[in-house]
Swiss-Prot record:
Localization per record: Cell membrane
Gene label: OR11H1
Cysteines joined through disulfide linkages: 112-194
Residue ranges that the UniProt entry lists as topological domain Extracellular: 1-44, 94-112, 180-216, 281-287
Membrane-side (Cytoplasmic) residue stretches: 66-72, 134-158, 238-259, 309-326
InterPro entries in UniProt: GPCR_Rhodpsn, GPCR_Rhodpsn_7TM, Olfact_rcpt, Olfactory_GPCR1
Sugar-bearing residue positions: 13, 18, 106
Name of the protein in its database record: Olfactory receptor 11H1
Species, as recorded: Homo sapiens
Function: Odorant receptor.
Length: 326
């Protein structure tokens, strides 16, 4: 895990341009402005979603760790991805749930930027890991004879570590730069999480270069990895069409189908939210989009893999002890 140094308080211009700056040690996450009964309903709904997400991804990671037959690079990558999903959803949802029942809905200055850092870093690590998983699929289908010699346990470990390290380094500089910027009151972020878009709206001084830097990094992560995945699966599709056996084509398609579904779900939401932030999106829609990729996507991922993959379904039945449960 990469160390992150943030100033604990921010500077806020409290009145006129010539006035002094006041230290601020917290933000207010406005969230959804609705009646108390609706807040309780949303709390119950998102608590259930969070519990199901943790349970589903935890079950996938656990069965892949327990079943030695699935200790292959493809399934170990999936286990790491499920483990990442647990931490990804936990970087924002617990605080969000607390705020549903809180009157003030505050978050400390350092806590806000740490949430932003971990949310984006874990998301970046997931994007990188999905790309590595696509590369693994390419090797397995397009280079089956060379696959055991290329995708060794040593290379697998290197790729996983690289995804984690690069993910946590990618947004380190932007988060430090944003944390040092003075902002104008009130210290209210009109969002459900500490997102850079609403945070930039509070800045006293326009910082187009920093904003461009952040959006460029986001676009590089999203489009760079997405194009690599598209390229990998173009070659995979070409290899599949050249297979003489329909059984082989069906097996290859079933192996890739789950990963493609997860990639589509993940990148579609990311592109909508971060490629053109603030363009054509109302504040309410931005909150809904954030909830979708922060909670709904991690919930569906274990369902997609468990329903599509026979080996994982068999492993789940074995661990749960009953073939009638799955």
């Amino acid at each position: 895990m990469c160390p992150l140094t943030l100033q604990v308080t921010g500077l806020m211009n409290v009145s006129e341009p010539n006035s002094s700056f006041a230290f601020v040690n917290e933000f207010i996450l406005q969230g959804f402005s609705c009646e108390w009964t609706i807040q309780i309903f949303l709390f119950s709904l998102f608590t259930t979603t969070y519990a199901l997400t943790i349970t589903g991804n935890g079950a996938i990671a656990f069965v892949l760790w327990c079943d030695r037959r699935l200790h292959t690079p493809m399934y170990m990558f999936l286990g790491n991805f499920s483990f990442l999903e647990i931490w990804y959803v936990s970087s924002t949802v617990p605080k969000m749930l607390v705020n549903f029942l809180s009157e003030k809905k505050n978050i400390s200055f350092a806590g806000c930027f740490l949430q932003f850092y971990f949310f984006f870093s874990l998301g970046t690590s997931e994007c990188l890991l999905l790309t590595v998983m696509a590369f693994d699929q390419y090797l397995a289908i397009c280079r089956p004879l060379l696959y055991p010699n290329i995708m060794t346990g040593h290379l697998y470990a290197k790729l996983v570590i690289l995804c984690w390290v690069c993910g946590f380094l990618w947004f380190l500089i932007p988060i430090v730069l944003i944390s040092q910027m003075p902002f104008c009151g009130p210290n209210i972020i009109d969002h459900v999480v500490c997102d850079p878009g609403p945070r930039f709206a509070l800045d006293c001084v326009s910082a187009p270069r920093i904003q461009l830097f952040c959006y460029t990094l986001s676009s590089l992560v999203i489009f760079g990895n997405f194009l690599f995945i598209i390229g990998s699966y173009t070659l995979v599709l070409k290899a599949m069409l050249g297979m003489p056996s329909s059984t082989g084509r069906h097996k290859a398609f079933s192996t890739c189908g789950s990963h493609l579904a997860v990639v589509s779900l993940c990148y579609s939401s990311l592109m909508v939210m971060y490629v053109s932030p603030g363009l054509g999106h109302s504040t309410g829609m931005q909150k809904i989009e954030t909830l979708f990729y922060a909670m709904v996507t991690p919930l569906f991922n274990p369902l997609i893999y468990s329903l599509q993959n026979k080996e994982i379904k068999a492993a789940l039945r074995k661990v749960l002890g009953s073939s009638n449960i799955i």
